[in-house]
Each structure stands twice: as C-alpha cells, then as structure tokens.
Amino acid sequence: ANTFRFNFSHGDHQEQGDRMATVKLAEKLAGKKVGFLLDTKGPEIRTELFEGDAKEYSYKTGEKIRVATKQGIKSTRDVIALNVAGALDIYDDVEVGRQVLVDDGKLGLRVIAKDDATREFEVEVENDGVVAKQKGVNIPNTKIPFPALAERDNDDIRFGLEQGINFIAISFVRTAKDVNEVRAICEETGNGHVQLFAKIENQQGIDNLDEIIEAADGIMIARGDMGIEVPFEMV
C-alpha cells in the first residue's frame, strides 16, 4: 500500500488520531513513507434514532406510513424521522412522486402526498424490507440545499491537516464551490500543497462535472451512492 484512507464518516478524532499514529509507527518500522487520505463524511441524510428499545421496523409492500422532516425528533413505526446534515427541514424540497430510498436502496418509499400542517410526507412502501436507525437515505432527482461545507467536515479537515494528511476526498461534491471551500481551509492553514479529490455521487455533481474538474486535483466516481441516485445503467 502507498496510501492509507481514513474514513471520517465513522469514529471521533481520538479514534482517527490513534489510527494515524499506528500508520506513522509502521512507516518508521518499514522505512517507507505513505500517503494519508482523509475521506470526509459529507452532507447526508440518515434515519433518526428510534423511540423506545426498537432496533428496526419491518414493512410490507403497499403499506402506507409517514416520513417526518422536522429535525430533532425520533422515529416511530408509523413516522420515520430524518436527520439531515445542517439540521435542514427538506419538506419543501421534495415533490410528490419522488422516491425515498433507505439503506442503499434496500427499502423504497414513494411520496404520495404531503401534509403541510405536520410537514410530513405520506409514503407507500414499494418492497418488503426494514428500516433501522441511522441508515443512509437517498432522494433521487431532488436538489437538497446543503451547506457547501458542514461544520463537522470543517472540524475534521482542520484536525486532519494538523496530523499532516496529504489528500482529502470530499464527499458528495455538487459544485465547484464545495471544492473551493475546502481549498480555502487548506491555504488558510498553510496546507496549500494538500491535493483535493472530488467524489461525484449524485446527479447534481454529474451536471456540474466540468466546473468540478477545474476546481479539484482529481475526481472519484463513487459508484455506490451514484448507483442509488441515478439509474444504475447510467453510472
């Protein structure tokens, strides 16, 4: 291996710092230098924690349940709550007819109505499956107004730069602005040499690919998430 990837979607700074220290020790023992790549968590949507002791909820095709966009509430079997990066309420951004895909598309929900009073979607279950807490959620063909750089990513990047990372993989890049904000942090901290790789994972990133390529040092085609956001045969 000549580069080690540190996935900041999981673990805290203590855990990541310990991993980096282990690799640095291995460098000394092997007499070889390797690259350190920080992979950001990025802006994302996940299912919320559950009320009570439930670990997951099971659903059958054709069932009708609700999805809540209000932030800071817990899920029940009848109302699945979403945790959105930046604490955004995405109710107004999602149209009737859109799919809500849970856990890499293992469960599909179709928005059939919107309740303005509760700011909840009424959804129909498209296949038998389960919903567990803190699982990833994708809403294809929907532009979510995430901040260019989430507070957590900002903190993680600054921590990684202090540890001497060489590369940053920026998750869910949608526009050149996403790359430029990370570049500004690198330059501000005297780390302008760090190379930035934009991860293309959704339709908006595809639409703005040319400007993203201009802004970044390289791109990664994250076919896993992209295969959920766009038709698989288009990846």
Residues of each region from the PLM?
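Non-catalytic helical/linker scaffolds that mediate oligomerization, partner binding
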Residues: 1-235
